[in-house]
Amino acid sequence: MSDSDKELENQIIEAGEKLIDPPSSLDELLSFLDKLFVSLAEVEQSPPDSMQNALTPLMKGLVGGKLFKHSDVDVKVAVAACISEITRITAPDAPYDDDQMKEVFKLIVSSFEDLVDKSSRSYAKRISILETVAKVRSCVVMLDLECDALLIEMFQHFLKAIRDHHSGNVFSSMENIMTLVLEESEDIPSEMLSPILHSVKKDDEISQVSRRLAEQVLSNCASKLKTYLTEAVKSSGVPLDKYSNIVASICEGTFSALQQDQVVANEKEDSQGHIKRETEVEKAAEISTPERTDAPKDESGKSGVSNGVAQQNDSSVDTDSMKKQDDTGAKDEPQQLDNPRNTDLNNTTEEKPDVEHQIEEKENESSSVKQADLSKDSDIKEETEPAELLDSKDVLTSPPVDSSVTAATSSENEKNKSVQILPSKTSGDETANVSSPSMAEELPEQSVPKKTANQKKKESSTEEVKPSASIATEEVSEEPNTSEPQVTKKSGKKVASSSKTKPTVPPSKKSTSETKVAKQSEKKVVGSDNAQESTKPKEEKKKPGRGKAIDEESLHTSSGDNEKPAVSSGKLASKSKKEAKQTVEESPNSNTKRKRSLGQGKASGESLVGSRIKVWWPMDQAYYKGVVESYDAAKKKHLVIYDDGDQEILYLKNQKWSPLDESELSQDEEAADQTGQEEDASTVPLTKKAKTGKQSKMDNSSAKKGSGAGSSKAKATPASKSSKTSQDDKTASKSKDSKEASREEEASSEEESEEEEPPKTVGKSGSSRSKKDISSVSKSGKSKASSKKKEEPSKATTSSKSKSGPVKSVPAKSKTGKGKAKSGSASTPASKAKESASESESEETPKEPEPATKAKSGKSQGSQSKSGKKRKR
């Protein structure tokens, strides 16, 4: 334990002792609670036993009567902030029993009441409580405890307190909490929907940001709310046309069609805007002599050029947000993308009236929900089109500049650590094992489309050099659910069995994908636009106990298919590992709110059956790929079969998962093609050797009898091969009659060899080439020469005696390698010719059983890999 951890434990212990008799002075008490909150914020989740023991008296003291029911509001908020940190530390376990947790939730919900007061002393603590509740998902525990009244009160506080001056993090936290409560509720009462419906009325008294929050929540839960929303509207007694258009579209079942129409309209407007921007760029290039120097000074004008893209101050809210990103100064809350009106906080006061005027015009033309969706979609399009000129602005692939942007999104007390989730008692282990999207929620929504833009660029650059790769990518996108899982499993076995004597790399769940990524990394050399993607995090969580070996030889093979110059295996392995890490690190970030509303909503039906997805395992800290095999409509659960053969029945709404994107599917398809080529290549020598037929088997057995060194020694050096080949040529020039006679003699010797020794022994000795055998080949150079001399007379006696009667002593002598030829037995020229031919054949034939042994070792290796214990979820 480090000194800082020990010091932190001492601070926690002292605070717990002080809570027994807290300071009587209000100022001293608030100062003490402030220090305690800072100390608790430094404690990591799931701490060691010593820290848990130090926290025990502190946890009891915080729920004591003196502090818990204090009359001062700031003291209550400070206590609630400390308790919310404790719920984060102890997650996924609740820190208190059910009755105490109900009281804790009352205190937490009461702290949300004055979120509107930004000048309050406790404002930062209120924001911290809000973010912690969203991350730990403790609102699900409120559902389990049937705290419906508290949930309704919390909804009311959110919709009343939200303001334009709040950061995007506040807006997204409120949205996530409300969406989660509605999605996880088995039955949604009309009282819970009442504050949301009140906020979407066509009433001037309701603030625009409150209406936008309510509409966003309704949009996220549209599929589930159809029945409940209709009943709530009827019970309210307010006509349907008095509400926002999104309410009518959900009740009438036209919400999905409305979204599709909106997307089409956005694409048309975007294409027209793109043409206008190109003409603006040309005009600006002709008018302004120094483009780069004049553009920043021309901010108050109608157009300016930044990175080659014309931007207009009064064109739209989205254009202003683009200008904000191009600005090199400090940026304010990137997640204000969810709140389009707040994206202009850094602009000058002269620009704000124009922006508000544009928003009002849009609201007159269409509904509020259309305006919100339009601003998001067009913002995404604005950034996707000039992606080639704005690569440095990419959120997912940019260098450490983006880390400061991500840090800006957090509040004063935001911590860069993973947060587990409090489990739902009804959902059991399923919810307990789901990790909250900690960093994914902090990233702006541009991250997903920008990633897509980079993928498109990569595909286009790859198409110029290798059209076949692009065709494979298209096939994967068209048929992602057919043969992909089986091919992936085959490729995993192939990699595992490709080498027997090489040292293996430490195994991971993604072992098969590393070889796939090695192939992709070569393509990224061609697509130079994506060179910056190599700067990725250098740590990868590995799944324990899942042993699938990867050797350097297999990495060479996978990269060699691209006809690139041979690279050292160390560099190639490191490059492929970086790419695999990129896949692991990027996927949590892509699970944003927008993707949740469109993608994760599918988990309630059968539309996911047959899809390739990846599921987050919090204990292993890794994503595992699999296929959605089936869906149980009664239980609303999916059967997921992982690539390693494991099966799970999951309630996907409680899991952290995401469908495989095009890049990952294309990697799988490329690996499948590569595996097919390897299998075809491995079968070609087998068929060639099979043509030798009976003779190769016969030569194998006779060589075993004569040499006494086993067929594993029959693999000679190239020099010996050439000498024997020349000897073959000489003997082949002899008469054809002698060859026919020798064939008959060998047929009889084959029968004797089969009687003496079962075929199993030959197969095993021929195929098992251990390190000991390999070393014996090099050591027995001299014994080979003598064994060859012994081989000729021994074979001659075998063939000559085979006609007269059974041979007993000769095979026994030849097996030990000590048998000597009888002086009286003279070998005929025909037998000599056949001996030399059999020697040359034995040079080649022992390679034949190798694939069988490979298959055996592959099976044993596969069984070993599956025997590794997977951490229980």
Curated annotation (Swiss-Prot):
InterPro entries: ARM-type_fold, Pds5. One of its GO terms (biological process) is DNA recombination. HEAT repeats lie at residues 53-92, 99-136, 149-187, 189-227. Residues 303-319, 336-348, 400-411, 418-438 have a biased composition (Polar residues). Residues 266-611, 658-873 are annotated as: Disordered. Its main location: nucleus. Coiled coil: none annotated. It is found in: Nucleus. Disruption phenotype: Weak impact on meiosis such as formation of some chromosome bridges at late anaphase I and telophase I in forming pollen, but severe effects on development, fertility, somatic homologous recombination (HR) and DNA repair, especially in plants lacking PDS5A, PDS5B, PDS5C, PDS5D and PDS5E. Gene3D superfamilies: 2.30.30.140. Residues 661-681, 747-757 have a biased composition (Acidic residues). One of its GO terms (cellular component) is nucleus. Cohesin cofactor dispensable during the meiotic division but playing an important role in DNA repair by homologous recombination (HR) probably by helping SMC5/SMC6 complex. Regulator of sister chromatid cohesion in mitosis which may stabilize cohesin complex association with chromatin. May couple sister chromatid cohesion during mitosis to DNA replication. Cohesion ensures that chromosome partitioning is accurate in both meiotic and mitotic cells and plays an important role in DNA repair. Interacts with the cohesin complex. Belongs to the PDS5 family. This is Sister chromatid cohesion protein PDS5 homolog C. It comes from Arabidopsis thaliana (Mouse-ear cress). The gene is PDS5C.
